[in-house]
């Protein structure tokens, strides 16, 4: 079972009920709220505006056709990752078919990540590895301000005419932690495939569509003075827990006599917590 970039952030009860629906009465599931529908609509509008603006820049951009089937998207993504001259890939889709095609194109053993499927908004070429193959960094488009005050973290603010993180202006601040967790998912998948940077660069384009807020996951600190670790390590822990919840829920779906995979816990987060839950 491959999980997407939201899994590490989702409530365990939501995961439990999603993967063991036969163990619950879900007939009175709450409808999605008007607020959530409007937030999604505004997010789609912002993403379209950001991409429209990006296409006006003098950059080599490859767009994966969103009307293709999943297999075609994955094959096109693999070709783009390995053989294209593109500086930016829009709409990449990375799962098993893409992984197998990458192995074919590079002549090396398939580097599979059986736990993840990745669909980043953008992938930006940030260099080449010792093998001569491109290295990519994931970038998401967000309609909110992705930058938070934090004295223990660093960002590198770049513009489209000098888009690499190494060309960005260093700033003492931190990416939104939910955004960082989603980007960590994509980074970890790329790392497994040998296509990520050693520095762990990820980025967000927020309300200011002319700026890329780059960060190193290891410099995205949690807790006072970074004593609670960094966003990359935190994501790996939460994703591992999510995998266990899903596995237990799938087992319970087959055998309802098994104990619950998780217990309810109030979580106020509007995007991923109880405020957004339809169960």
Residue ranges and their predicted role:
Residues 92-96, 124-128, 142-145, 206-209, ...:
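Short, flexible loop/turn elements at secondary-structure junctions
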Residues 87, 121-122, 135-137, 197-203:
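Beta-sheet entry/capping signal
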Residues 54-58, 98, 143, 250-254, ...:
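Generic secondary-structure transition motif, activating predominantly at the C-termini of alpha-helices
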Residues 118-169, 186:
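Conserved catalytic cores of phosphodiester-cleaving nucleases, focusing on short active-site segments
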Residues 1-133:
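Metal-dependent nuclease catalytic cores that hydrolyze phosphodiester bonds in DNA/RNA
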Residues 17, 40, 57, 66, ...:
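Context-gated lysine
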Residues 13, 91, 118-121, 140-144, ...:
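Residue-level signal for functionally critical sites in structured catalytic/ligand-binding pockets
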Residues 151-181, 185-278:
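Metal-dependent nuclease catalytic regions and adjoining charged, substrate-binding loops involved
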């Amino acid at each position: 079972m491959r999980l997407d970039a939201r899994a590490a952030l989702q409530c365990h009860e939501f995961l439990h009920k999603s993967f063991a629906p036969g163990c619950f009465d879900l007939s009175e599931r709450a409808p999605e709220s008007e607020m959530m529908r409007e937030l999604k609509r505004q997010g789609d509008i912002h993403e379209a505006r950001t991409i429209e603006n990006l296409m006006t820049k003098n950059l080599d951009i490859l767009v994966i056709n969103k009307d293709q089937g999943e297999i075609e998207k994955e094959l096109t993504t693999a070709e783009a990752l390995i053989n294209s001259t593109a500086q930016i890939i829009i709409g990449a889709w990375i799962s098993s078919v893409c992984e197998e095609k990458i192995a074919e194109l590079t002549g090396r053993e398939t580097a599979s990540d059986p736990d993840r499927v990745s669909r980043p908004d953008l992938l930006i070429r940030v260099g080449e590895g010792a093998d001569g193959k491109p290295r990519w960094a994931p970038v998401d488009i967000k309609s909110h301000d992705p930058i938070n005050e934090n004295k223990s973290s660093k960002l590198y603010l770049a513009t489209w005419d000098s888009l690499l993180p190494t060309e960005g202006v260093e700033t003492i601040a931190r990416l939104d932690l939910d955004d960082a967790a989603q980007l960590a998912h994509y980074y970890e998948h790329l790392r497994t495939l040998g296509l990520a940077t050693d520095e762990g660069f990820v980025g967000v384009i927020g309300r200011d569509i002319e700026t890329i807020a780059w960060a190193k996951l290891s410099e995205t600190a949690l807790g006072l003075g970074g004593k609670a670790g960094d966003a990359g390590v935190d994501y790996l822990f939460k994703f591992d827990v999510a995998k266990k919840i899903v596995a237990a829920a799938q087992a319970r779906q087959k055998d309802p006599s098994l104990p619950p995979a998780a217990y309810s816990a109030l979580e106020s987060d509007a995007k991923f917590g109880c405020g957004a839950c339809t169960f």
